[in-house]
Amino acid sequence: MTEPTYIPLRLHTEFSITDGMVRIKKLIAKAQEYGLPALGISDLMNEFGLVKFYKACRSAGIKPIGAADVRIGNPDAPDKPFRAMLIIRNDAGYLRLSELLTAAYVGKDRNVHHAELNPEWLENGDNSGLICLSGAHYGEVGVNLLNGNEDAARAAALKYAAWFPDAFYLELQRLPERPEWEACVSGSVKLAEELGLPVVATHPTQFMSRDDFNAHEARVCIAGGWVLTDKKRPRDFTPSQFFIPPETMAERFSDLPEALENTVEIAKRCNLHITLGKNFLPLFPTPDGLSLDDYLVKLSNEGLQERMVQLYPDEAERAAKMPEYQERLDFELNIIIQMKFPGYFLIVQDFINWAKTHGCPVGPGRGSGAGSLVAYSLKITDLDPLKYALLFERFLNPERVSMPDFDVDFCQANRGRVIEYVREKYGAEAVSQIVTFGTMSSKAVIRDVGRVLELPFTLCDKLSKLIPLEANKPLGLDDAMKAEPQIQELIEAEEADELITLAKKLEDLTRGLGMHAGGVLIAPGKISDYSPVYQADESASPVSMYDKGDVEDVGLVKFDFLGLRNLTIIEMAQNNIKNTTGDIVDVGTIPLDDQTAYQIFRDANTTAVFQFESTGMKKMLKTAHTTKFEELIAFVSLYRPGPMDNIPDFVARMKGQEFQYIHPLLEGILAPTYGIMVYQEQVMQAAQIIGGYSLGGADLLRRAMGKKKPEEMVKHREIFAEGAAKQGISREKSDEIFNYMEKFAGYGFNKSHAAAYALISYQTAWLKAHYPAEFMAATMSSELDNTDQLKHFYDDCRANGIEFLPPDINESDYRFTPYPDMKIRYALGAIKGTGEAAVESITSARQSGGKFTGLLDFCERVGKEHMNRRTLEALIRGGAFDSIEPNRAMLLANIDLAMNNADQKAANANQGGLFDMMEDAIEPVRLIDAPMWSESEKLAEEKTVIGFYLSGHPFGPYAQEVRQIAPQKLSKLKPQDSVRLAGFVTAVRTMMGKRGKIAFVSLEDLSGQVEIMVGGQTLENCADCLKADQVLIIESKVSRDDYGGGDGLRILANQVMTLQTARERYARSLSLALAPHHDIGELVQLLAAHQLPDTPRIPLQLSYANEKASGRLQVPPKWTVTPSSALFGELETLLGSRSVRVNW
């Protein structure tokens, strides 16, 4: 093989995040095409892509060179750091670069404004494992050369040469578009000759081909928040910065061949080695000098004894059961010790038991770990695996060596405390979370590129929304354009070809950084010895620079600390129960055969019940009539794509329909699921019983079936048939059983996971059945910021007979508060514009000084630090002051006066002396009067901060009236060809369907809400009247929504009328309810103005009421009026909507 002439060293991949769009897979393919024996990448201040690059190079037979393009602090211009490239020479260099990058993000003396290396770190540290390139025109040497300061350039070169003895190169770059760089090249060559330093040529690669330049500019603008036409935006890159072949570099540096030769020399000096496939567990301290093996055995046996007392209180029964449990425990312990995983189990049980004893609720289990009796004995899980036939081999297979993986659910509110405990136990430097990479999906990239191209938002939004979803993920742009022709039509109509061209180039490129939902790394020492650490800002948690797959490859062990909202709900509900009733409830000890709890499932009353909230699940429950826990486990497993097809058969068999097992030998394992394979564990057990597999081997078979690898399936089919033949089973029957297993292995569910989650489902249902107000208050408190969910739960509460008390500054807390007799006080924290700190200041003032007496008193006592004008307005609009002053308009009018008064009193109090003596002489503040809002105004204002109507409903004043012609309640709708509906419009949205424009109208009455489709000619006829915040009467057709699943309804409008139009068409008389405050003279004038000649008129009916009496007034026959929208509107403005009623 000929000696290479040039090795690329400087290259930004997509993992530079703010620039660079080189994808590693394409890079390696092009490097092979160029015949490169070695290749380097140097992402900006990170090593996010290093492991992926390393593995790809090794697979392609290319020597990987790891490096980072680093910023180095510039004390003379802190906002303009210098640049250099640090290349890994050996293992020491790998650790050193990781250490430096970690210090730049999480070190105590880091730059908090942007990540950079402190020059002192380089001066004082051991850099012997690194090679440094000067950074060309961006480096300290190059900047000074371009500024004409040769002395400073010389001093910098000597400084770096001292930091990196025999490993510092002056870097040379040439681009056709950058002739000004030549001064840096010539100056560097001159310095090199003078100081005896080597030079090296690099090409600053940012993208793969020249025609990627515009897309790369768009990528830089997306990251920086600029638009492409902005003349002030940075233009740091040129079209020449693509991945050029060695021949181009040879031409470009033909006058400096040694600069090219040194790229090869550097490649030879570098030997990057990353250890892959070896696990590094943290050291777990054990007492009394016990080994990890002995300590695990000790804790497991002690824990089993404790569990057995709980499971079998009767001593004789416990003694009879103990041998079975002890045998299973010993079996598991032997495998765990044989596979060298005692340390893993001990670490997990330690932080879980710390959480349980420090007020941090932990889930009963998650994933296959619930199948381990050792885990149950150590209190890692809380479900007896023997009782529910859960298999250890599904979790830890002795025939397939891989790390065990406990996914642990913690109460969301306390999860951080457990992670902090781990930090304290193992050291902060040994613990971090895991980075994730956000990419530009097809929908997102359309919006991003559209913004930098300054295209109309409506166009980009429309295009983005046209992209279809598949399995809840948007299709790629190419597939989307094939599936949805409207995309291409819209692009052509709007001349948006450039948008699609750039979007396709950027699609799926790494765009941003995130944090893995639950993964926590614990290392045997510093995390940075295995992966550099990144931290977005002061408030963020440190994360590894390697993602989940990469950290596992380098041997770091991931522990999953997942936050589960439902555990927080259960904990809050238990506290609520204690506060309201005095009962001490521990859902971990409730019986699993409580039929009151199962009635919740039978009634499909499962809103807020974990895993059973969806419409489709409720539909299944209505037909199932479940009575036992095993059925809940099956439902959790069945209600998913694929297994859902078996639900009708499963339910029918539950109810007594006869069925046959596929083979009598499988009756024992299939009986709990009525002959249907539901769980992965059943596939494994069938392989064991029929095919003679060990459970470990059966797990390998299950995995092979799931992956559908033909060559493996042929092999396993023969093994299975041989085992079946030993049982006297024919080849035809064994193939039938094998095919049946293969079908279910593809989508069978992990029973251990289903059982653990079914337990949480049952616990939440039990709480809802026995303590509904306490449970629902906790549920709503977990969703304070989610208005849609709060409305959903509010409606469910009302349907279950729970009464809501309004928010009240003298009664409410931050969260929802349950009261005896099925009442819940609305939470101040659920009012938009408040916050926990603001509410804390209210409750604190209330506790120390008693109830508030008015707005002035409130403002004087509640600290201004957290109670700003916006928060005060929100509380007033939400009705939180109604108990001390029901006139919300008047309170709003006096906010400035009240806050200024509070400020003045605080200032006077600080002065003391004379002001104290004058306090009594100061004239009291008088509040400004203001007319009360009408009912509709009050509700509209209330909705802006509550999110829905709480103290009333805008449909209320009209309900009795419109029920005369539209008696159907929305909550009681059933399929029917024609029905007249009435309600208040809360929202209208439109979209383009295949047959044209469609409007979706959200309609509410006092019983519930529906969505009505309006299209075609009907939409054309009523387009002007489809607006929110009005009453509509709609002639509709109601049918079953088979497409949507569950028992949803599809409602199609045939005719739409506003209330005013309906009144004009159907009114027979007009009733007006008068009160002392009404202006009768103005009323008479108004009515007279609507006695139009030559028009149909309707008679008036008047009533009058004051504090002493009420009665009907006789109206002369001549007082008839012409019904019209104008008349009804004016009357409602004058008298109020509740005083005007049309009789139909």
UniProtKB/Swiss-Prot annotation:
Catalytic reaction annotation: DNA(n) + a 2'-deoxyribonucleoside 5'-triphosphate = DNA(n+1) + diphosphate
GO cellular component: cytoplasm
Localization: Cytoplasm
One Gene Ontology MF term: 3'-5' exonuclease activity
InterPro entries cross-referenced by the UniProt entry: DNA_pol3_alpha_NTPase_dom, DNA_pol3_alpha_thumb_dom, DNA_pol3_finger, DNA_pol_IIIA_C, DnaE2/DnaE/PolC, DNAPol_HHH, NA-bd_OB-fold, NA-bd_OB_tRNA
Pfam family, one: DNA_pol3_alpha
GO biological process: DNA replication
Keyword annotations from UniProtKB, A to Z: Cytoplasm, DNA replication, DNA-directed DNA polymerase, Nucleotidyltransferase, Transferase
Enzyme Commission number: 2.7.7.7
Cited CDD domains: DnaE_OBF (cd04485), PHP_PolIIIA_DnaE1 (cd07433)
UniProt key word Transferase: yes
The protein's role, per its UniProt record: DNA polymerase III is a complex, multichain enzyme responsible for most of the replicative synthesis in bacteria. This DNA polymerase also exhibits 3' to 5' exonuclease activity. The alpha chain is the DNA polymerase.
PANTHER family on file: DNA POLYMERASE III SUBUNIT ALPHA
Subunit and interaction comment: DNA polymerase III contains a core (composed of alpha, epsilon and theta chains) that associates with a tau subunit. This core dimerizes to form the PolIII' complex. PolIII' associates with the gamma complex (composed of gamma, delta, delta', psi and chi chains) and with the beta chain to form the complete DNA polymerase III complex.
Family: Belongs to the DNA polymerase type-C family. DnaE subfamily.
Record-given protein name: DNA polymerase III subunit alpha
Gene name of the encoded protein: dnaE
